[in-house]
């Protein structure tokens, strides 16, 4: 059974309603290029953090000796990475997120020294400021290296001064001594400000002050309103999706599971669910503050690149660890075998479930999911983005809101925020695996509906 006629992605962006059937496709073709994917599948839990960086740097790996000369490295297992990730500045092997960018230890230290010591005023390029940066040239031209750091997204406001580092260490030592004198010997209880999924984003938890790292942190009125709007928009879009449930091709029951008709029906069933998800994401994006301020081309570019990643986030959100199944639209529940019967490859199915399990361990609530999705949408490094600076500026309030929210919700878990951002790196990996899956479907002569073909740039 064929899937229902769907609309072009190009049609719904400026308006306020869901895509309309029969609309012509006129969106620009997106080249299959962009940021180099990070191979290796979903990321493990991040084992350490760098106290010398501010929280917005999400600098969670090897501490820089020059930032904390008296600090001894902690013993234990080395931080695990996703694979052979590359530094976004010089192309060397990356060690983690530093100052908001996946980068190597060398570029991390260089950027910090440049900011703290005012190196930008002293650097000069002999080649007119056009040097191509790599692991060799990074030592030859400091001006172009600093320029590339900023172009990659490193933020000066994430760098702490020596005085700030010293005060932060003193404050932490005082907190630790107070904790030891007040707490009885034994396992530490859970924080009263921590809560499970579904916590109210604007209630007492988000608006109250925490302890430890969360002490003094409070959401602004604008941040509380932003979170409430995002959560409400997601709920509204989700309810609209339920109304499309009767339109989905039924999952074949009782028929020969290996018959051609049954295989086609299962494939149609999954593609129609994907169409509903895409329409829900487009509808949600239009309600994200700032999205409709962008030009039409950038709206399309951001949606084309982020849709599959948001779909995977929503898939993880619906994962049931007890049954190891994923539920869509309340009534459709699927196991790994069901995904395989629908024509998906094990190489794509297994990472989906691994990612879903990792997300469940984080225990995100509705507000955190909504903020993470908004951050994902406003990714300035997507292919064909015309105004990356504007996109990055729109993303920043959501990053800051998520940082504050997580520090209030789980003040004792300093790694929660960087772990969330690392999940966005995992999504880039899954996105590249998805591209391979789409190519495999084409080899099987399985034709995708027009909307999915357009948004995933499948050209027959």
Curated annotation (Swiss-Prot):
<feature type="DNA-binding region" description="Nuclear receptor">
    <location>
        <begin position="84"/>
        <end position="161"/>
    </location>
</feature>
<keyword id="KW-1017">Isopeptide bond</keyword>
<dbReference type="GO" id="GO:1903573">
    <property type="term" value="P:negative regulation of response to endoplasmic reticulum stress"/>
</dbReference>
<dbReference type="InterPro" id="IPR000536">
    <property type="entry name" value="Nucl_hrmn_rcpt_lig-bd"/>
</dbReference>
<dbReference type="GO" id="GO:0045723">
    <property type="term" value="P:positive regulation of fatty acid biosynthetic process"/>
</dbReference>
<dbReference type="GO" id="GO:0090340">
    <property type="term" value="P:positive regulation of secretion of lysosomal enzymes"/>
</dbReference>
<dbReference type="GO" id="GO:0032376">
    <property type="term" value="P:positive regulation of cholesterol transport"/>
</dbReference>
<feature type="compositionally biased region" description="Low complexity">
    <location>
        <begin position="1"/>
        <end position="14"/>
    </location>
</feature>
<dbReference type="Pfam" id="PF00105">
    <property type="entry name" value="zf-C4"/>
</dbReference>
<dbReference type="GO" id="GO:0003677">
    <property type="term" value="F:DNA binding"/>
</dbReference>
<keyword id="KW-0862">Zinc</keyword>
<protein>
    <recommendedName>
        <fullName>Oxysterols receptor LXR-beta</fullName>
    </recommendedName>
</protein>
<dbReference type="InterPro" id="IPR050234">
    <property type="entry name" value="Nuclear_hormone_rcpt_NR1"/>
</dbReference>
<dbReference type="GO" id="GO:0036151">
    <property type="term" value="P:phosphatidylcholine acyl-chain remodeling"/>
</dbReference>
<dbReference type="GO" id="GO:0048384">
    <property type="term" value="P:retinoic acid receptor signaling pathway"/>
</dbReference>
<dbReference type="InterPro" id="IPR001628">
    <property type="entry name" value="Znf_hrmn_rcpt"/>
</dbReference>
<dbReference type="GO" id="GO:0031490">
    <property type="term" value="F:chromatin DNA binding"/>
</dbReference>
<dbReference type="InterPro" id="IPR013088">
    <property type="entry name" value="Znf_NHR/GATA"/>
</dbReference>
<dbReference type="GO" id="GO:0000978">
    <property type="term" value="F:RNA polymerase II cis-regulatory region sequence-specific DNA binding"/>
</dbReference>
<dbReference type="GO" id="GO:0120163">
    <property type="term" value="P:negative regulation of cold-induced thermogenesis"/>
</dbReference>
<keyword id="KW-0805">Transcription regulation</keyword>
<dbReference type="GO" id="GO:0032369">
    <property type="term" value="P:negative regulation of lipid transport"/>
</dbReference>
<dbReference type="GO" id="GO:0034191">
    <property type="term" value="F:apolipoprotein A-I receptor binding"/>
</dbReference>
<feature type="compositionally biased region" description="Low complexity">
    <location>
        <begin position="175"/>
        <end position="198"/>
    </location>
</feature>
<dbReference type="InterPro" id="IPR023257">
    <property type="entry name" value="Liver_X_rcpt"/>
</dbReference>
<feature type="zinc finger region" description="NR C4-type">
    <location>
        <begin position="125"/>
        <end position="149"/>
    </location>
</feature>
<comment type="subunit">
    <text>Forms a heterodimer with RXR. Interacts with CCAR2 (via N-terminus) in a ligand-independent manner. Interacts (when sumoylated) with GPS2; interaction with GPS2 onto hepatic acute phase protein promoters prevents N-Cor corepressor complex dissociation. Interacts with ABCA12 and ABCA1; this interaction is required for ABCA1 localization to the cell surface and is necessary for its normal activity and stability.</text>
</comment>
<keyword id="KW-0675">Receptor</keyword>
<dbReference type="GO" id="GO:0001228">
    <property type="term" value="F:DNA-binding transcription activator activity, RNA polymerase II-specific"/>
</dbReference>
<dbReference type="GO" id="GO:0010628">
    <property type="term" value="P:positive regulation of gene expression"/>
</dbReference>
<feature type="zinc finger region" description="NR C4-type">
    <location>
        <begin position="87"/>
        <end position="107"/>
    </location>
</feature>
<feature type="cross-link" description="Glycyl lysine isopeptide (Lys-Gly) (interchain with G-Cter in SUMO2)">
    <location>
        <position position="447"/>
    </location>
</feature>
<keyword id="KW-0832">Ubl conjugation</keyword>
<dbReference type="GO" id="GO:0090108">
    <property type="term" value="P:positive regulation of high-density lipoprotein particle assembly"/>
</dbReference>
<feature type="region of interest" description="Disordered">
    <location>
        <begin position="1"/>
        <end position="78"/>
    </location>
</feature>
<dbReference type="GO" id="GO:0090187">
    <property type="term" value="P:positive regulation of pancreatic juice secretion"/>
</dbReference>
<dbReference type="GO" id="GO:0005634">
    <property type="term" value="C:nucleus"/>
</dbReference>
<feature type="compositionally biased region" description="Pro residues">
    <location>
        <begin position="36"/>
        <end position="45"/>
    </location>
</feature>
<keyword id="KW-0804">Transcription</keyword>
<dbReference type="GO" id="GO:0051117">
    <property type="term" value="F:ATPase binding"/>
</dbReference>
<dbReference type="GO" id="GO:1902895">
    <property type="term" value="P:positive regulation of miRNA transcription"/>
</dbReference>
<dbReference type="GO" id="GO:0005829">
    <property type="term" value="C:cytosol"/>
</dbReference>
